């Protein structure tokens, strides 16, 4: 028994229940490609009910080449949805081929990080709509040409119903009230890599990765949207062995991807690109978190190549040899050095910079894949990615950027005027009048604020100060003029009256003992200044250790009230003690306090350094008092001077 081989039925390209002729029609004026749509009589288009009976359009969210996106409500469930209107040519029932690709690809996608296509809706009005009579915006045209409006406005409308997302990444980055921490950035990047890896493993190219196409719902889940430029990829799916994926040999158009997110191989005119073009866009999004704006803003296609090489450096033959054989190889004659590390070193550590450099590798076959980028050490170091992303209680979309800018301008205009900074010198005023360069250094320096002065003082005095030990490297601080609080012995003052800690403070300086003459001889400013003047005139011995003097000695403010204390007259030729530099004097100066040395028929008084370094002040009980039994001349100090000092 023989069987007859029947020819298999020809597969017809279908979307829903609409049969389509696989003939692509190209518009001569715009260069856009369409598919001619033909349906049978009395056939329900796309198998759904009429649009007006199920959905209601509200505000406009965005606009694209082939349609507009609105915020809408499903009347049956009162659920918010996003309605994407697809432009249809009226004269020949032409359906955009990019919309057809987007619909077919979204129907095959099922991932948490990819936007879900709910349904396709068809609405047909009996008469063509116009902008003035239609209750909702129809058509997508540019300019004010009435003829173009009539071509684009038609009675047939196709709508893609998508879940409504409260925010997109562009709106969040431009919102001044939103700040992303590093843990939030890692959370978003991991979700983005998960979604793009799913797309590549299913052998598709997105070809329009940018912040405006990255949506985030109210639960913090990232969704990749806008598959209008997506298409099938005929190469092998990416894997861990080949970083940039294997090329398929198929030619693709180079007019894809928004210019600022366009990969360098597309900029140089390569049409045999791979899935690495989407990885470059993810690298641009990653860097945009830290500058709040696109990092590669080229004005033209040629300028875009210069901007890329200024950031990553001009590639050599070893780094990217294919670049010298592409149509745009003229850009390789530049000589730029990479500025990536210098530009982002403040925001990223070495691990983060390594991930960014691999995402933005110039050679597409050396560029990291999404599968491998997910395992980068950057995502496994502190701070770890947040388990759930937290968003503000407001909607943030790309259409809100103008509102954010106006809010910033209003807040700046409502600020009070700044305080005057003072007048400039006459010389600078003459320069300003004559047109000479006005130096910035000419402004009057501002006095340091109290907190600046306080910050230079250590938090607490050194421990050696409480036991009286001398420290040689203690900075000299100005003596406070405020009255010091008095307290009990062996205690430290507390409460609001406590002064800032001073490294030169000791118990003796905090609670000074009044002298036998009723004058504070240790800490008062007047006594300090008076003693300093008196010492400079030679009244005090210059051989005294300056550090011990500054720390432990202070002469009285007025010595005239004590008749027994008189300033010794210094002999001609120098201060009083320095004239008597003999062996007896040098020997006696180191034996203790209040020692006298015999020098001829004159006596010199020299208080030597204390042998006990822990002694505080001159009136210590450890220093022995010795009276001189020899006769004194008029230039000899009385013996009770030692008691005073």
UniProtKB/Swiss-Prot annotation:
Gene Ontology MF: a single term: cyclin-dependent protein serine/threonine kinase activity
Protein name: Serine/threonine-protein kinase BUR1
Matching InterPro entries: CDK (IPR050108), Kinase-like_dom_sf (IPR011009), Prot_kinase_dom (IPR000719), Protein_kinase_ATP_BS (IPR017441), Ser/Thr_kinase_AS (IPR008271)
Role description: Serine/threonine-protein kinase involved in transcription regulation. Phosphorylates the UBC2/RAD6 ubiquitin-conjugating enzyme (E2), leading to monoubiquitination of histone H2B and the silencing of telomeric-associated genes. Also required for histone H3 methylation. Necessary for the recovery from pheromone-induced growth arrest in the cell cycle G1 phase.
Gene3D superfamilies: Phosphorylase Kinase, domain 1, Transferase(Phosphotransferase) domain 1
GO BP term, pick one: positive regulation of biosynthetic process
Subcellular location: Nucleus
One Gene Ontology cellular component annotation held by this UniProt entry: serine/threonine protein kinase complex
Region entry Disordered, spans: 407-428, 442-513, 533-645
Natural source organism: Kluyveromyces lactis (strain ATCC 8585 / CBS 2359 / DSM 70799 / NBRC 1267 / NRRL Y-1140 / WM37)
Bias-annotated ranges (Pro residues): 477-486
Enzymatic reactions: L-seryl-[protein] + ATP = O-phospho-L-seryl-[protein] + ADP + H(+); L-threonyl-[protein] + ATP = O-phospho-L-threonyl-[protein] + ADP + H(+); [DNA-directed RNA polymerase] + ATP = phospho-[DNA-directed RNA polymerase] + ADP + H(+)
Matches recorded under PANTHER family: CELL DIVISION PROTEIN KINASE (PTHR24056), CYCLIN-DEPENDENT KINASE 9 (PTHR24056:SF233)
Uppermost EC category: transferase
Stated family: Belongs to the protein kinase superfamily. CMGC Ser/Thr protein kinase family. CDC2/CDKX subfamily.
Biased composition annotated in UniProt, kind: Polar residues: 409-428, 457-474, 578-598
Lineage per the UniProt record: Eukaryota, Fungi, Dikarya, Ascomycota, Saccharomycotina
Protein kinase domain segment(s): 55-379
Chief place where the protein resides: nucleus
Pfam family for this entry, one: Pkinase
Lyase is among the record's keywords: no
Gene name, Swiss-Prot/TrEMBL: BUR1
UniProt key word Transferase: yes
